[in-house]
């Protein structure tokens, strides 16, 4: 079996473990404080992660899909959560959120392209993400409106995010003398910028939807996550039965 396929199976199994754990948390909703517990925040983060993962996966491949699901989505959920409780956006927070996303992008670049590109892309993306957080701050106040909202602030965030990450991808490819550096960088910039803008625009609807979910519905989501997690973990055991071995 090819090395990248083996790595994919291992990551799929790890994802299954994470989904199974999340499902267990949902089923223990009452034990974790009910409406005052962390599960609604987790639901929002997972929702954003699925949307980021889908957008990145369809255009940039499986590794960026995982970066979107495991890092970009939760980061946006935490940003909005901090905004909703009145927490400021200090420089330390900017570094934390920026480095989280940059690390995931660097790993995705490493696995989808090569190690040198991934290292360069991770470092340069960190500069771009932190600059975005420091200059533009947290998501706009309209995030609490309960309906999709696009204004100059949302568009500015999308353009700045897309330009900075696209430039990071172009420079990373150019440093490594890759012939398609410009094309790939423009592609990455467009995808990240458009995805960021759209997700921030629809975030008010996601926030309102999750806040109004019935408790029983959350239990149903927990059961679904447990099932999906079990299927992901089962995949590694099915392959040997089909005669496919490492």
Task: Put a short name on every predicted segment.
Residues 13-16, 38-50:
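Loop-to-helix transition at the N-terminal end of transmembrane alpha-helices
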Residues 125, 173-204:
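Short alpha-helical packing/oligomerization segments
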Residues 59, 104-115, 170-181, 238-240:
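Juxtamembrane "helix-exit" motif on the non-cytosolic side of transmembrane helices
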Residues 10-15, 65-67, 91, 114-123, ...:
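Hydrophobic alpha-helical transmembrane segments
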């Amino acid at each position: 079996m090819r090395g990248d396929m083996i790595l994919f199976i291992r990551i799929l199994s790890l994802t299954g473990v994470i989904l199974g754990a999340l499902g267990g948390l949902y089923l223990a909703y009452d034990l974790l404080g009910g409406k005052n517990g962390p599960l609604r925040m987790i639901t929002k983060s997972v929702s954003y992660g699925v949307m980021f993962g889908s957008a990145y996966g369809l255009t940039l491949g499986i590794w960026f899909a995982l970066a979107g699901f495991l890092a970009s989505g939760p980061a946006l959920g935490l940003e909005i959560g901090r905004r909703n409780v009145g927490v400021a956006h200090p420089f330390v927070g900017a570094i934390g959120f920026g480095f989280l996303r940059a690390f995931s992008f660097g790993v995705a670049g490493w696995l989808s392209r090569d190690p040198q590109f991934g290292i360069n892309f991770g470092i340069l993306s960190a500069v771009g993400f932190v600059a975005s957080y420091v200059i533009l701050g947290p998501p706009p106040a309209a995030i609490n409106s309960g309906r999709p909202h696009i204004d100059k602030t949302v568009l500015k965030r999308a353009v700045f995010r897309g330009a900075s990450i696209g430039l990071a991808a172009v420079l990373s490819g150019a440093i490594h003398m890759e012939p398609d550096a410009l094309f790939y960088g423009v592609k990455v910039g467009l995808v990240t910028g458009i995805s960021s803008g759209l997700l921030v625009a629809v975030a008010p609807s996601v926030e309102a939807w999750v806040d109004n979910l019935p408790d029983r519905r959350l239990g149903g989501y927990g059961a679904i996550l447990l099932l999906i997690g079990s299927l992901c973990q089962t995949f590694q055991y099915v392959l040997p039965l089909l005669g496919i071995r490492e």
